[in-house]
Amino acid sequence: MRPQDSTGVAELQEPGLPLTDDAPPGATEEPAAAEAAGAPDRGRCWLCLSSPCCSRTEPEAKKKAPCPGLGLFYTLLSAFLFSVGSLFVKKVQDVHAVEISAFRCVFQMLVVIPCLIYRKTGFIGPKGQRIFLILRGVLGSTAMMLIYYAYQTMSLADATVITFSSPVFTSIFAWICLKEKYSPWDALFTVFTITGVILIVRPPFLFGSDTSGMEESYSGHLKGTFAAIGSAVFAASTLVILRKMGKSVDYFLSIWYYVVLGLVESVIILSVLGEWSLPYCGLDRLFLIFIGLFGLGGQIFITKALQIEKAGPVAIMKTMDVVFAFIFQIIFFNNVPTWWTVGGALCVVASNVGAAIRKWYQSSK
């Protein structure tokens, strides 16, 4: 799922990991996707639906698609799958968001273990990169938990749009930690994103006490907002760490740390909160399986899109996450977004598209 289940896209994106240079924005769900296009080739893998494996060298990863627009189609399909996964998270109201994260970690672990064994990369990683792998795992899984909580406590469209603020934090963190340039254009996109988030949150000191269009109380809306912003911050931190590690760490090893530490973190949090519960037979258990399946499918297709298409067009097409979130909110929850939400979404999407076009233009020089 999006995170960029945050990817770690952000997280497999987590929901909402952004694409600034080499990873798509918003999706949560899935931060390791950006890394996939640059990891070393180790052989063939069934997970990627093609051969050779998704972890390929950079020159190979950018080869032309078999047919024009295939990479954009993969991106659109990925956005749809992540959005459907988010819908199922919203539907599972009787299971805590952290427990949903734990189930997804277990599901992904069952997929990653045979891949690591097949690729013979080990389960620990290079000595000098282990601290970064640990940070990537903790921050990425935290981003996933927070976005799942946001999905459960506020409208699907609002939570999705706010997670698309992640590229703003990525630019700032990269400027501070990696000494990357922070240009006036980045500052302008930051202003657009902040404006969009304010329009969605509608703080009372600016908009009064009007809460029309919110499917929950304002306190619940505010909790979801903080969770979504927190998810965007942690997803951005994860992407900066992935950039720091570069291509020295195998793609699946990065995911391995994410799912293992995410599961440990989930167990600790659930034990402290006393929120352990066995999902009811029937739809809830089916939804949990679908969350894992659609999150995995979304990650596979965003990875393949980044292999055969430039990052800029992928980032622009990835904004379809927001469109699907609006459609699902109207169809499945009978909740028509307000004009404030639409205006906020346009500001955030415009910021993401502008940043993607600028990066695309710079890379084509």
UniProtKB/Swiss-Prot annotation:
Tissue expression profile of the protein: Ubiquitously expressed.
Domain EamA: 80-202, 233-357
Pfam families according to UniProt: EamA
Domain of life: Eukaryota
GO terms for biological process, alphabetical: calcium ion export across plasma membrane; regulation of cytosolic calcium ion concentration
Complexes and interactors: Interacts with STIM1; stimulated by depletion of intracellular calcium. Interacts with ORAI1. Interacts with the plasma membrane calcium-transporting ATPases ATP2B1 and ATP2B4. Interacts with ATP1A1, ATP2A2, KPNB1 and XPO1.
Entry protein name: Solute carrier family 35 member G1
